[in-house]
Amino acid sequence: MAGPQRATSGLPTRRTTTRQPTRRAGSAIPERQTSTASPAVSTKTAAISRTRTLKSPGEPASVLAKRKERDIEREINEDTSIHVVVRCRGRNEREVKENSGVVLQTEGVKGKTVELSMGPNAVSNKTYTFDKVFSAAADQITVYEDVVLPIVTEMLAGYNCTIFAYGQTGTGKTYTMSGDMTDTLGILSDNAGIIPRVLYSLFAKLADTESTVKCSFIELYNEELRDLLSAEENPKLKIYDNEQKKGHMSTLVQGMEETYIDSATAGIKLLQQGSHKRQVAATKCNDLSSRSHTVFTITVNIKRTTESGEEYVCPGKLNLVDLAGSENIGRSGAENKRATEAGLINKSLLTLGRVINALVDKSQHIPYRESKLTRLLQDSLGGRTKTCIIATISPARSNLEETISTLDYAFRAKNIRNKPQINSTMPKMTLLREFTAEIEKLKAELIATRHRNGVYMSVESYEEMKMENESRRIISEEQRAKIESMESSLRHKVQELLTLTSKFNDLKKDNDDTLAALCSTNDVLQQTDIVLQNTRAQLEEEEMLRCAHEETEHQLQDVGKGLISTLGQTVEDINSLQSKLDRKAELDATNAELWRASSTEVSDVTKRIDQRVEAFQTRHAKLLETTSVKVNEFIATEISNIERTRSDLSEYNRSLDAACNNAKAETSSAHEDMNNVLEEIKDLREEVKSKVGEGLNGLSAAAARISEEVIGEFTQLHSQLHTSFNNLGKDLKSIFETMATHLSEQKNEINRLRAELQSSNRQNIETTHKASAHLAQAIEEEHVAAEAEREILMSQIKALVEESRQKQFARLRAKIDGVRTEISASGDMLEQATTQHDRQIDEWVFKSEQFAKDVNASKDEIRTKLQNDWEAFDQRNSTIRKATESVHKETVRIVDVQVDDMGRQMEALDDFVAKARSQNGRYRDAHIATLDTIATGVRDSYSSIEGRVENLTGRMNQFQQEATHHHATLEESIAPLSNDVRKPLTDLSSSFQNRSLEEYVATGVTPKKRKYDYISVLPSTESHEVLKSRLRTTKEMEVLPFNSDDQLSGPSSSPGGSPSKGFVYNDVEDEVGTHAPTVTNVNPSNTGLREVDANVAARPLVYSTGEKSTDQDGSPVVSPDSATEAEGMNGPPSKRRRSNSVVADTKLPNKMLARRMAGMMEGRENVPPPGISNGRRLRGRPSP
């Protein structure tokens, strides 16, 4: 036998390695009973339970525990949000080599917001707000102290807590949760993650308390749970729902081992052991990519003592979840097994996202059961657990999409509301009883295994196995009963098969009889086939005519497109000419602005010259006044000396006279020089006037020439557009008149066809009723004749004949009733088809009239639009011509004004020159008079100043120097006058010579004179008779190789009859060789009603709404069978023989003909042949 099996227990397996509390030196256990074991013990709930314990110290422990739980549930009933933390790692070597930019910004090392750059095309960046945000500069200890340490404190207070890392693969989830798991002499590495730090911190907080710590480590790989701490190779774990009180559901993992630890080092060894078993693999995104989700659970039971001395156990649990990262298979390069792993990981994470969305939206159904991951996290998301999510993200731009997804999930998870509650406390004795029961159970299994008393399992396992065997036995008996029932059913089915076989033989006999009856109706089908062939020939003619009309319509459409294209070219040319006119108008406006600027400049120059001359006059007057003052002072000073020295100057009279003559000569010379300068100014003025006049006259001539050219071009364009619009209007008028005529003809033809169709339908109905009446009469006559013959033979075979008569009469009566019913139904369907056809014809006529109205409206609208466009263009042309003429007149006016203004300026300049000349003469005369006066005074004073002549000579020398200085000053003031007056005039002349008007430059866009080609003759369709004649000739050529026996020629006496048509049968199912269908007008002179055999009513017929007509004389065409049956009893035998001969000549198999006729008769039974009738006609017509 196999070794003893271990009993499966409903409770998790534990290793009883309870750690004993360490005691400090000099302390005892009773002293620790009143000390606080943890900072969280001083919570409000603990205070309440202590208060209740003090009030009732004599109550038992169970009552105190229940009261404590009720108090806790009353106090802690508030919802709390999930704590969400974001941690951003730095760029790795791969991202640095790829030069992937950074798209994240945080508020320093620790903050609460993260800003995401959405790229240059985004309107703005995206900002997320979380409880805490850590940048890449934050180390492991910072994250632990700010995030995990408060959660550890809450766990020690009795809460269930969960921390799980969520994010893209390769963003540091495993590094955050586990990190560097090595320790040196009890000192953790700086890169140690949350789990090692939690273990060390936990045991440091529990150093002075009596407690137990147990750990479990499970893995979710490919949706299968595995225990990473189990000694077995592949332990299978199962998840069950653990329903607690008040309907709250939690999950329980069956078969998971929970190992008790007594130090942080032991816990780290378990973590290392499980991490080595965890599934990892290398991808393009991460060299050590986690391929599974892991949950490291730490459960703490702390013994506490109330103030009354009662001991109880307070449990707390911390779930540390390391999720596998979401992965893009295309970027990570996962294949085969790795691709399957990535798909399952993404599936579980998507389910987690749906759970988060459902919790945020407060949906009625939360999809926890869609994934084992969400079932494990069920209590952490929306349950009674305090939860913290650490979202890890990458700052690289290459991971922007995954980063946005991670931040969106984390941001939505903030809105999840949990209801954390402190775990129920358990008295110490209750916990010991549970441990004792489990120990006893394990001992029983161990004893059963050691003794090997025949069953290597416990009694419970053996009973369970017996129950499974009994269940299998019951299932086997049920299957055996089902087999017996199925065998009995099979026997019944065999009997039913035999019965069906006999019925099949009977039906086969009936089928043979039916086939015999079917052969008797083949002649009717053959006759119908002949009628159908004639109808097809006529349909081919109609289809050919329709195709001809369609081709003509396409040609007319092409002509219309050409006309529209020509119209588009004309409009484009008009737009180009209008653009040219706009450019010329802009050029004229620019030249006018230039002339206004020139006029302003000339006015400014003349004003400046006038101002400068006036300033010169002012300065010159001041100098003269100064000189006069100085001379007067000098004379007044020296009069006394001259009077005393006059006697001494007599000898100088001659020299004084000579000096006077010289002064007069020099003054005259200065006068002549001034006159010469003024003459040069006058010559310069005449030259400027002549040049400016020539420039303005040239400008006026150019403006006149431009105006004449523009007016000429607009006149030519006006005539061309007038001709083009007239031609276009004529063409459109011709097209619309043709369309209106065509629509009117179609309307008349439709009315005529409607009248003919109604007459034909009435005649067809009357003929059908007559045939039905004749058929009933013939049946009665045959019945009477058969009765007479049976009475003669009654004496011999009375009984046999009576039975035969009754059967024959019953069969005949049934067939006749069926035929009569089908004929009536056929008449009703014909009336319905006629009504429907009339309604469709009315709709067609209405649409045609509507179309004609639309065409007329479009014609009037186009005519109005063309007239409006022409009037607008004519008005625009007149406006442009007037504007051009006004521009020319304005240019001439401006030029005349400029010439007049220049003349006035030159006249002012002449006045100035004359004024300068007169002033110079007066100055010369005054100077000579002054010299004469001085000379006379000197001569009179010679006698008195001779004694002082030496002093006078010195003073005269000084006066001469001053006079020379003043003379030089006068010359210096005169020289700038010439420059100030001449230079502005020279600049003005140069400006006029260098400034030219802008000339029009051809752009090459102005359209050239072109010839518009368009079609003036519209295509038309040939006459119907010519087209039909051509089709008949073609068909005659096609039937030449066949014998005359294969053709059915119509009677030569039929009016308008076509040549003989051949019928060629092809043994292909449902295939008839016909030409493409055409539609045309119907020639009423060659139409007739096809024959309809009274016995052809085997199936309902669908009547088409095609065109129908009557004969030339309006009488219906009746089939030979109907005619002979109407004439009497001698007709049917000869007619029957005629039908059989026709069938024999066609040589068409009966079955194939029946199938073909069934397809060809569908919808075409009573379509009258348009145009020409090739069918067989009656040998005699009934009188109308």
Curated annotation (Swiss-Prot):
Cell location: Cytoplasm, Cytoskeleton
Listed GO biological process terms: cell division; initial mitotic spindle pole body separation; microtubule-based movement; mitotic spindle assembly; mitotic spindle disassembly; spindle elongation
Primary location: cytoplasm
Keywords: ATP-binding, Cell cycle, Cell division, Coiled coil, Cytoplasm, Cytoskeleton, Microtubule, Mitosis, Motor protein, Nucleotide-binding, Phosphoprotein
Low complexity compositional bias, start-end: 12-24, 1049-1060
UniProt cross-references to InterPro entries, sorted A to Z: KIF11-like, KIF11-like_kin_motor_dom, Kinesin-assoc_MT-bd_dom, Kinesin_motor_CS, Kinesin_motor_dom, Kinesin_motor_dom_sf, P-loop_NTPase
Region (Globular): 901-1184
Composition bias, Polar residues: 1-11, 32-51
GO cellular component terms attached to this protein's record: cytoplasm; mitotic spindle; nucleus; spindle microtubule
Any one Gene Ontology molecular-function term assigned to this protein's record: molecular adaptor activity
Domain of life: Eukaryota
Residue intervals of the Kinesin motor domain: 81-416
Coiled coil: 489-900
Chain residues that bind ATP: G167, Q168, T169, G170, T171, G172, K173, T174
Modified positions (Phosphothreonine) in chain numbering: T1006
Ranges for region Disordered: 1-64, 1041-1065, 1104-1184
Family of this protein: Belongs to the TRAFAC class myosin-kinesin ATPase superfamily. Kinesin family. BimC subfamily.
Role: Important role in mitotic dividing cells. Microtubule motor required for spindle body separation.
Name under which the protein is recorded: Kinesin-like protein bimC
Provenance organism: Emericella nidulans (strain FGSC A4 / ATCC 38163 / CBS 112.46 / NRRL 194 / M139) (Aspergillus nidulans)
Taxonomic path: Eukaryota, Fungi, Dikarya, Ascomycota, Pezizomycotina
